[in-house]
Structure formats: C-alpha cells, structure tokens
Amino acid sequence: MTRLDSVERAVADIAAGKAVIVIDDEDRENEGDLIFAAEKATPEMVAFMVRYTSGYLCVPLDGAICDRLGLLPMYAVNQDKHGTAYTVTVDARNGVGTGISASDRATTMRLLADPTSIAEDFTRPGHVVPLRAKDGGVLRRPGHTEAAVDLARMAGLQPAGAICEIVSQKDEGSMAQTDELRVFADEHDLAMITIADLIEWRRKHEKHIERIAEARIPTRHGEFRAIGYTSIYEEVEHVALVRGEIAGPNSDGDDVLVRVHSECLTGDVFGSRRCDCGPQLDAAMAMVAREGRGIVLYMRGHEGRGIGLMHKLQAYQLQDAGEDTVDANLKLGFPADARDYGIGAQILVDLGVRSMRLLTNNPAKRVGLDGYGLHIIERVPLPVRANAENIRYLMTKRDKMGHDLAGLDDFHESVHLPGEFGGAL
C-alpha cells in the first residue's frame, strides 16, 4: 500500500507556502494534482508546476470570490463529466506582460486571492483558469477544486488555490499514478494525501448538517423513527427512516442495512411505471423492517438524478420522442447523473453508521458514499420490477450506467413494446 502523509502536515505545508500532492478516488479521475495556495504563488512555484504537470494551470476559488470578481461560467451549461466548474479565463490587468510567463501567472494567481481585488483588475480572456468550488468543499464534491480551497482555508489563508495534474515521467502522454507520485513526492519533499483523507479529517472536525426533529412513523412495514435533517449549504430537507438501534449501548454502528433513496415524486408518490423507484423504496423499507435494524435515507433534491422535477418532465418529453434516459439528460445539457451524496454521507455518520450493507443496484452510489469515509462491506441488490413501460429505461441504466440488473433480456423478449417510450430518471 502506498505511503501517505497526514492532513496536518499538508495543511502546515500549504500555510508555509509549499506545494502538496492530492490524489482523488481511483474510480474518478485517479490522478494526483500539485496544489499550493494562490496567495503564496511565486514565479519559481509556477515554473515548477509547469515543468511537472500538464501545464493547464487552474485557480480554484470560493464561490464568494467568483461572485465578487464577476467570474462567469466558461459555458452556460456545464458538460464536464466530473462537473468541474470552469470560469472565463483571466490575466492580471497590470504588472504583467503577455500573461503566459511563470511570473505573469503567479501575479494573476496572487491577485485572484487578494481580498481587495475587483473585477476590473483582470482582463478576459487570459492565461489562468479560475474554477468555482462547490460550497461545502470536499464534503459536497470530492474533487481537486474543492480540496485546494479547503486546504487553503484550513491553513488560515484566503480560500484560493492553484492546481494542475502531474504527468508521468515514465510513460509519456499519461498521467502519473499513485506509486510514481509517491516517488515524486519524496524526491521533492512534498506531502501527499488523498481527497478521502481530507474528507475524513473534515468529517471529524466539522459538521454541516443539523438534526431538526424526530417522530414515530407507523407504516405498513411496521414502525420507523423519522429523523429530519437540514443542511447549511442547501435549502433542502432530508429524512431518515430508522429501524432499531444503529449505535448505542447495544450496537456499534457496524453492519447496518442502508438504503440511500433519491427522491422521485412521479414514482414514489404517483406510482409511475416509467421507473422502478417506487418499488425500490417499498422493497427497501420491507427489507429493513425484516432485518429489524437499518436505515432508509430519503434524499430530497435528487429528483431526476439531480436535475429537478421540471427538467425531468422535459426529459420525459424527449424520451417519448425516442431518446433514452441518458441521452435525454445530455440533450438538456445535464450530466447523466448529477446527484451528490455528500450530505447523505454526513447524515449516516450522524446516525452512528460506521460500516454498512448498501441496498442498491447502482455501483456509482457505492463509490459516491465510499469516498466519504463510510465503509461499505457489501452491496445488496434490490429486486428488479420490470414492466412494458420501464424495460427500455432499465436496459439503458444497465448498458450505459453500469447498473447491476439481471434478467432484463428475458423480459424484453417476452413483451410487446409500445413504441419508443422512456423511463424515469
């Protein structure tokens, strides 16, 4: 296993004006970025970064800084597959030449981090790429953008960083992988951490959710405790249906049966047959009830895989015209799946979960939660409820999104499909 350094060392190095290496999830970009605080930028540091990276230097910024400086999105509808929020490129208006030299880019970086700078201090376009970090940092989005801003803030500096991906010195044209990054870090006396480490550190030292209320909810599957939560970063309320003791005198928070269910008004409430959401929710509640211990976490704000109810209905229109559930999202300018599991992970931790058996057919959900320090010991499949209205939707989820859905081909061959229909999101 590759040796890593402590988050405390990385924060101290950032505060001292040094660079660090941050590695993300192997199921995400699986790359290591060189990161330092933007306000500490020097020509020497920028030159070092250019020499050992792709050279596409970016400056992650807190959202408030982007707003103050009028840094608009590079494109109106973000189509980056990881949701990286690129803004219009900039150069410092004064004190630079063409803007491309190490000295010029260091000047622009420091100016972006300067709390007294204003929009008119920059020209557009330029040679430095600001990135807008998501509010809540790595707890909301486990990316290098958020890691850079979090590290700067944790170091007591302005929430602005500088990042770029480290390239391989052994395999020209490729990005450096973990073992090579460790060698590089040791050669240059750089701390190396993972985003997962940073998430775990913040989870232990910070809290971004609030437990509001708890009440008894009798259901046809038996009685649950409904525990309501809010998040300081979004105006959305979530509810956890809890059965049994999760953590306490007689339970240690391990081996908990958990379903993280995304809100679906059409399927959960109206009983739409275009998706399998309602049957999945019902099955999850039944399985937790039979177990006698577990959680069904109902995540609001996840309608349509995160695009919202109105856009979901627009996607239905496209599906009725022949698009599948993935292409409909893409045609509307959204990613195939825009859901964020960070708040859900914090709620599970607050409920005392340490390790869990996750009720899902979606491997990406496992990755989304695993990156937040929760240990998933098993993925437990949910029964697939195929019908003539959702079979194409289910097959698209299987074929394009990697969902583990068995038996669909046999069902598909046994039914007459009523034209080009689509599924829920």
Swiss-Prot record:
Listed SUPFAM superfamilies: RibA-like (SSF142695), YrdC/RibB (SSF55821)
Cystine connections: none
Domain of life: Bacteria
Keywords on record: GTP-binding, Hydrolase, Lyase, Magnesium, Manganese, Metal-binding, Multifunctional enzyme, Nucleotide-binding, Riboflavin biosynthesis, Zinc
Binding residues annotated for GTP, in chain numbering: R259, V260, H261, S262, E263, Q280, E303, G304, R305, T325, T360, K365
Region annotation GTP cyclohydrolase II: where it falls in the sequence: 205-425
Chain positions recorded as Zn(2+) binding sites: C264, C275, C277
Gene Ontology, cellular component aspect: cytosol
Free-text comment on the cofactor: Binds 2 divalent metal cations per subunit. Magnesium or manganese.
Binding site for Mg(2+) 2: E29, H144
Keyword field contains Plastid: no
Family, per entry: In the N-terminal section; belongs to the DHBP synthase family.
Name of the protein: Riboflavin biosynthesis protein RibBA
Native species: Mycobacterium avium (strain 104)
